[in-house]
Structure formats: C-alpha cells, structure tokens
C-alpha cells in the first residue's frame, strides 16, 4: 500500500488498452460510415487516465502489441501522467482494435478485432508485483477473465493486491460479443464478485446479470455481498444509485448534449476512486459520498460531449469549472422562478 508520508495514494488499473475507431458521423452502420477517427481506449486504461487527469496517482498493468499502436498507447499513458511500469509488449500479437457504431443518441455498438490480441496473452509471471503491492486501490474489469493466460494473471494480481491491503474496485464493463455465450459471461463475471469492495454496474449490466428487467432497489440489492462497501448502478441520463451497509439513495446527473457515451462510465469510476483513495471514510458518510458522486456524475457527463474515450476525459479544472457553471445556472433559475412568483411575469 501507499506510504503515509503525504504522498497521494496510488490507483492501479488492470486490464486492456486498445484503439477505438469511432465513425465521423452518428446514426449510421459501420459499413455506411464515410470514415473513422482513431481514439485510444479500453476501460481500465480509461480509468487510469481519468484518475491522473483529475490530479491523482495512477498506474496501468496490462499487455500491448509490440507494434505502432501498442507503443502509441504506452506513450499516451505516459503523456497523461500514468505510471507505465506494469506494461508488457508481445512480439507475436497485435494491439486490440474496436470499431464503434454511434447511434444518433450517442449510445454505442462494438465490433472487436482481437483473435487473440496482446492483452489476452498477459501471463502471471509477467506481472509487476511490486507495483501492484503499492496500490491503495486496485481496479479491474471482466474482459481479462475471458481467456487464459490473462485470466490467471488477473486472479494473481487481484490476490496480491488484496493481500497487500488494497481496496478492490470492480467494473464488469460487459462486452457480450467477446464472450462465448451469455451464460459464460455471467458465470465468469460473478466468479470474482465477492472479492470486490466497490462494484459499479450500468443499468444494462444490472439487467444482464440479474436477468431481471425491473430496475429497482430490490433488483440491485440482489447483487450485494457481505464484504461489499459500495454498490453503484449508473443510469445514464438518470444519474446513479448507491448502496452501502448503512444507507442508500440516488444522485441526479447533469443534462448535456451527448455526442458519444464511450468512456463516460470509466470517467465516473476514475473520479470516484480519485476522490476516495486517500480517505475511504467517505464510504461511511452519506453527505460526503453524495458530494463525491455528484463530482463523478459531472465527469461522466463532460466525457459524453466529445468523441472518443480518453480524449474526452476531463481535467480537475474542467470538472470544477463545469460544476461551478451548473451551480450558477441553478441559482439563476431559482432567482428567475422567485421573480415570477413575487411579481407579474
């Protein structure tokens, strides 16, 4: 774990990093798109960069192809202040690619090229265990559970981090087309469920994992386990709901003109982890937790206003400026309503 010398706690993110190819226009199929924009992505890498841009300490552990794309991605991590000592390069496999279809509302569909890609080939003996042991928070998804040897590397890294005292953060980041079957996806995603201290799922993932279309607290709480400290369900434009052992509630999001929702959930998670890494007592204080989640919602909302994941992740200055503007708008709206009530409008 991080030392108590005043240095910020380290958040280590484990998993995949890839290239997203995002269409230049929304609302068309991949074959109909006139062109694509190249954008770095991969949920765990997105979270690491989100943390760093917000002023936190972040490291990434994973494997990239020993190709132009792989070295480009490693350079992007370094450029954004993310520790890259956990990266390995594979000479025999390519960096993963994903083509993303954008609907008119900014939601996405994916087509992946990873058969196998370098991230799937990370071995347990390639892990930087010293880096993992230094984590105060260890974050991961489920894509690294799909195949060996990466699954074994994932399990080893998670075990080492837990033994070292790290808080474990899990965002399944369901990508159903990558799994052999929906049943296999559920089984493997849930196989490590009770290890995590913090779990974030989307409303789509909640329905998938519970096989229940009813989006209510009872459905969400069916995913609770005794060792869990915080369960979060993100609801897109409806904000998020939160559950702890002592309290639960919801926090509204901010309404923006969404262009691309890629990376919004990762931005949310990165903001949350960056805010709690050095003071985990926030998880037991509802008022403070709500403030943190409002900040995380703001970061997620900002991310949807630009195309691509990593290019859209906000800095701490951008996030605070956004919140300040939102507060000013709310104040002006309240004043306008008061004027109309106090005098003829």
From Swiss-Prot:
Q: Name one GO biological process term.
A: fructose metabolic process
Using the record for this protein, list the coiled-coil segments as residue ranges, or answer none.
none
Q: Which reaction does it catalyse?
A: D-fructose + ATP = D-fructose 6-phosphate + ADP + H(+)
Please name one Pfam family that this protein belongs to: PfkB
Identify the enzyme class: transferase
- GO cellular component terms listed in the entry, alphabetical order: cytosol; extracellular region
The family database entries (InterPro entries) matched by this protein are listed as:
Carboh/pur_kinase_PfkB_CS, PfkB_Carbo_kinase, PfkB_dom, Ribo/fructo_kinase, Ribokinase-like
For this UniProt record, the keywords arranged alphabetically read as follows:
ATP-binding, Carbohydrate metabolism, Kinase, Nucleotide-binding, Transferase
Return one GO MF term: ATP binding
Enzyme Commission designation: 2.7.1.4
Associated pathway: Glycan biosynthesis; starch biosynthesis
The task this protein performs is described as: May play an important role in maintaining the flux of carbon towards starch formation.
- Return the PANTHER family for the record: FRUCTOKINASE-2-RELATED, HEXOKINASE FAMILY MEMBER
Question: Which family is this protein grouped under?
Answer: Belongs to the carbohydrate kinase PfkB family.
Q: What is the protein name stated in its UniProt record?
A: Probable fructokinase-3
Source organism of this protein record: Arabidopsis thaliana
- Lineage summary: Eukaryota, Viridiplantae, Streptophyta, Embryophyta, Tracheophyta
């Amino acid at each position: 774990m991080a030392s108590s010398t005043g240095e910020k706690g380290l958040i280590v993110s484990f998993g995949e990093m890839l290239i997203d190819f995002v269409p230049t226009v929304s609302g068309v199929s991949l074959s109909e798109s006139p062109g694509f924009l190249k954008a770095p992505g991969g949920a765990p890498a997105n979270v690491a960069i989100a943390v760093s841009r917000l002023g936190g300490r972040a490291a990434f552990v994973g494997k990239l192809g020993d190709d132009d794309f792989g070295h480009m991605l490693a350079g992007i991590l370094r450029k954004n202040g993310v520790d890259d000592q956990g990266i390995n390069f594979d000479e025999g496999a390519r960096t993963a690619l994903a083509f993303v279809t954008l609907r008119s509302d900014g939601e996405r569909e994916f087509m992946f090229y990873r058969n196998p890609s370098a991230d799937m080939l990370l071995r347990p003996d390639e892990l930087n265990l010293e880096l993992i042991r230094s984590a105060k928070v260890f974050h991961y998804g489920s894509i690294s559970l799909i195949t060996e040897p990466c699954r074994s590397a994932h399990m080893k890294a998670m075990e080492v981090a837990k033994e070292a005292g790290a808080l474990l953060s899990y965002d399944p980041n369901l990508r159903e087309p990558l799994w052999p079957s929906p049943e296999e996806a559920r089984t493997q995603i849930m196989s490590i469920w009770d290890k995590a201290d913090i779990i974030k799922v989307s409303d789509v993932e909640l329905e998938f994992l519970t096989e229940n279309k009813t989006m209510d607290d009872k459905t969400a709480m069916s995913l609770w386990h005794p060792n869990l400290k915080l369960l979060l369900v993100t609801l897109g434009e409806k904000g998020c709901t939160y559950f702890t052992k002592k309290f639960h509630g919801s926090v509204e999001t901010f309404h923006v003109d969404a262009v691309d929702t890629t990376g919004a959930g990762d931005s949310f998670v990165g903001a949350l982890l960056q805010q709690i890494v050095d003071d985990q007592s926030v998880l037991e204080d509802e008022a403070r937790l709500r403030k943190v989640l409002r900040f995380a919602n703001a970061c997620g909302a900002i991310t949807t206003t630009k195309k691509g994941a990593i290019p859209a992740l906000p800095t701490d200055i951008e996030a605070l400026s956004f919140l300040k503007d939102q507060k000013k708008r709310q104040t002006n709206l309240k004043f306008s309503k008061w004027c109309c009530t106090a005098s003829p409008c």
